[in-house]
Amino acid sequence: MKNMGDGRRIARVEREIQATIAQFLIRGFKTPLPGLVTVASVKMPADLRAAKVYVSILGDEKQQDEALDLLQERAFEIQNYIGKELKMRYCPKLTFYLDHATEQVLKVEKILHELELERKANNPGEGSDESDDE
């Protein structure tokens, strides 16, 4: 039976690796990445020997592909940085994946905004009551 502390340890290591990769992208990445890159999350198995790194990249599809390719090309360098910073017994093998969650949130917000504008256009007197309460 697994120890309950193992799950907490894995989560802690995932957070530390996420922060360390983000730090590397800010300080150690010499080549400018296309788009705005954010490390969204890191997922690791119990043995901590691999890490799936989910990144959110704001930009068009070409920028996203270029940034993801560049991250994967430099994965070994990032792994070395993690090894030095975190002093882990085994440095995990990094694999980068595009995280679509941020993109989906932005799409939903845009749709909600458009619906709100449409509602106000169909009911012009409805939105002006808010200033009367002050």
From Swiss-Prot:
Q: What is the lineage of its organism?
A: Bacteria, Pseudomonadati, Bdellovibrionota, Bdellovibrionia, Bdellovibrionales
Naturally occurring in which organism (per UniProt):
Bdellovibrio bacteriovorus (strain ATCC 15356 / DSM 50701 / NCIMB 9529 / HD100)
User: What is the name of this protein?
Assistant: Ribosome-binding factor A
The record's section on SUPFAM superfamilies has: Ribosome-binding factor A, RbfA
* Signal peptide, first to last residue: none
Q: Which InterPro entries match?
A: KH_dom-like_a/b, RbfA, RbfA_dom_sf, Ribosome-bd_factorA_CS
The record's section on Pfam families has: RBFA
Molecular-function GO terms, alphabetical: ribosomal small subunit binding
Localization annotation:
Cytoplasm
Q: Which family does this protein fall into?
A: Belongs to the RbfA family.
**One of the GO BP terms on file:** maturation of SSU-rRNA
Function according to Swiss-Prot or TrEMBL? One of several proteins that assist in the late maturation steps of the functional core of the 30S ribosomal subunit. Associates with free 30S ribosomal subunits (but not with 30S subunits that are part of 70S ribosomes or polysomes). Required for efficient processing of 16S rRNA. May interact with the 5'-terminal helix region of 16S rRNA.
Gene designation per UniProt: rbfA
Quaternary structure annotation from Swiss-Prot or TrEMBL = Monomer. Binds 30S ribosomal subunits, but not 50S ribosomal subunits or 70S ribosomes.
One Gene Ontology cellular component annotation?
cytosol
Per UniProt, the keywords (alphabetical) are: Cytoplasm, Ribosome biogenesis
